[in-house]
């Protein structure tokens, strides 16, 4: 089974609205591992690793985010895989 890792940077109203919590929950639901963390500029960085189809499904979810957030922009890039345990909120 191929594993892919991607880094996402989500911009918009994504801090202080439960975005990382919902992102972690969605990642776990899709059997992904990685993390979500706030950046100093107001964006959220998300690393997700798992099956390519699940990564695509996750990316579609990130484009919308939870109802409490407003996603204005989603940047993504494939990165070298590392070992993560679970889906952490940093």
Swiss-Prot record:
Reaction(s) catalysed (UniProt annotation): an acyl phosphate + H2O = a carboxylate + phosphate + H(+)
Record keyword Magnesium present: no
Domain Acylphosphatase-like: 5-90
Highest taxon, organism lineage: Bacteria
Active-site residues annotated for this sequence: 20, 38
Pfam family membership, one: Acylphosphatase
UniProt-recorded Gene Ontology molecular function terms: acylphosphatase activity
UniProtKB keywords: Hydrolase
Coiled coil region boundaries: none
EC number in record: 3.6.1.7
Family in the record: Belongs to the acylphosphatase family.
Designated name of the protein: Acylphosphatase
Organism: Vibrio vulnificus (strain CMCP6)
Lineage: Bacteria, Pseudomonadati, Pseudomonadota, Gammaproteobacteria, Vibrionales
